[in-house]
């Protein structure tokens, strides 16, 4: 079953166009979203969250159109980026006290568990956090209101290899509990470890949406890694 669907989503800028983007997120699966910088990954994600207005197409979650059901849908999804841009001089404790008032499903036990798991100090302020810890703070908020779908933009950015592996293990645990994850990243080696499906975007268009093993078999050469396949496809597209 699909818990999120994009159908012919378009967004036009003076120098860039998101062109009829279509793919779906399968329940309880991790979908890797790959593409070079400027390919349209972040524009697609912002469209999925209604942070920008699309020029056309439809986005649905849980069978409901995002247009007209945004408030209800956003109670059931979580979003994380590699940056923290709000309340930079408030403490984590103060930010959380405000944030949880917006989520009736806020799980204080889960919050405390992930706070310890990520090694975050509630007395710290976002401006005092490393880039890696900012990523963890975003994830902490997304995981603490029992989100059924996680939309993650570069969630392993700024993390050391050990922390990245810990996070990938966590994603596996969440998947086992039925959580659906969209994992947008340029670190394709992470996706080789955890992704069930791959969405490949180039120049604003979806070039492939396939199960990971099928994507690698259909586009790869013997012995190539996902990263090597991606790099070669990009070079061929520019040739």
Q: What annotation goes with each model-predicted range?
A:
Residues 81-138:
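ABC-family P-loop ATPase nucleotide-binding domains
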Residues 57-68, 72-73:
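Conserved ABC transporter NBD signature motif
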Residues 36-40:
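Walker A (P-loop) phosphate-binding loop of ABC-type ATPase nucleotide-binding domains
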């Amino acid at each position: 079953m699909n818990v999120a669907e994009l159908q012919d989503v378009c967004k036009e800028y003076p120098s860039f166009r998101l062109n009829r983007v279509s793919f779906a997120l399968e329940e309880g699966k991790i979908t890797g979203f790959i593409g070079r910088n400027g390919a349209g990954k972040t524009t697609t994600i912002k469209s999925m969250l209604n942070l920008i207005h699309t020029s056309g197409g439809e986005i649905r979650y849980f069978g409901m159109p995002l247009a007209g059901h945004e408030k209800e849908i956003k109670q059931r999804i979580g979003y994380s980026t590699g940056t923290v841009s709000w309340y930079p001089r408030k403490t984590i404790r103060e930010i959380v006290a405000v944030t949880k008032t917006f989520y009736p499903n806020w799980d204080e036990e889960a919050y405390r568990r992930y706070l310890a798991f990520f090694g975050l100090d509630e007395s710290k302020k976002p401006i005092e956090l490393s880039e890696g810890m900012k990523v963890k703070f975003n994830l902490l908020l997304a995981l603490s209101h029992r989100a059924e779908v996680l939309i993650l933009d570069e969630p392993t950015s700024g993390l050391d290899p050990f922390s990245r592996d810990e996070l990938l293990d966590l994603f596996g645990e969440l998947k086992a509990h039925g959580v659906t994850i969209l994992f947008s990243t340029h670190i394709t080696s992470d996706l080789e470890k955890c992704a069930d499906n791959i969405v490949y975007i180039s120049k604003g268009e979806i070039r492939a949406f396939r199960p990971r093993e099928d994507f690698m078999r259909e586009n790869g050469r013997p012995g190539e890694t996902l990263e090597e396949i991606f790099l070669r496809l990009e070079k061929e597209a520019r040739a």
